[in-house]
Amino acid sequence: MTRLEGMAVGWGGLIASIGLLIGAERGDLTRAVAVAVAFTIGGFLAGVRAESLRPLHAALAAVAAYAFHAVFVVFGHLASLLGGPASPSFVPGETRTWVLTAFLGLVAAMIGGGIAMAWLRPQRADHRRRRDSRT
């Protein structure tokens, strides 16, 4: 039976949220590149950590990245209320740009999960490695 692994989603989402933080107050191109790179890595790491359903874990990691980002923004607002630096906005730029960036992040995470699925194959029940027919 396959199940969702919260640890895989959490780690992938945490890594992907770094891209959201890096691109928060930057231009559109910088934000898109940061999101694409971080979400690909986050999706890959979620896929590596998951035993099955790797692309699904990668997609959920992309959603978790926005949840982590929301928490970071709330803490940033609390810090700015206490006299710290200004906090990043949750939706930087125009709504259309934000939606496109979110879609780019989801696609990049799925690509990362797909790479993990292609590179990792489950072991056989007797714990011996399969011979690769390509070698």
Give the ranges of each region predicted by the language model.
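Juxtamembrane/disordered regions of integral membrane proteins
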Residues: 1-135
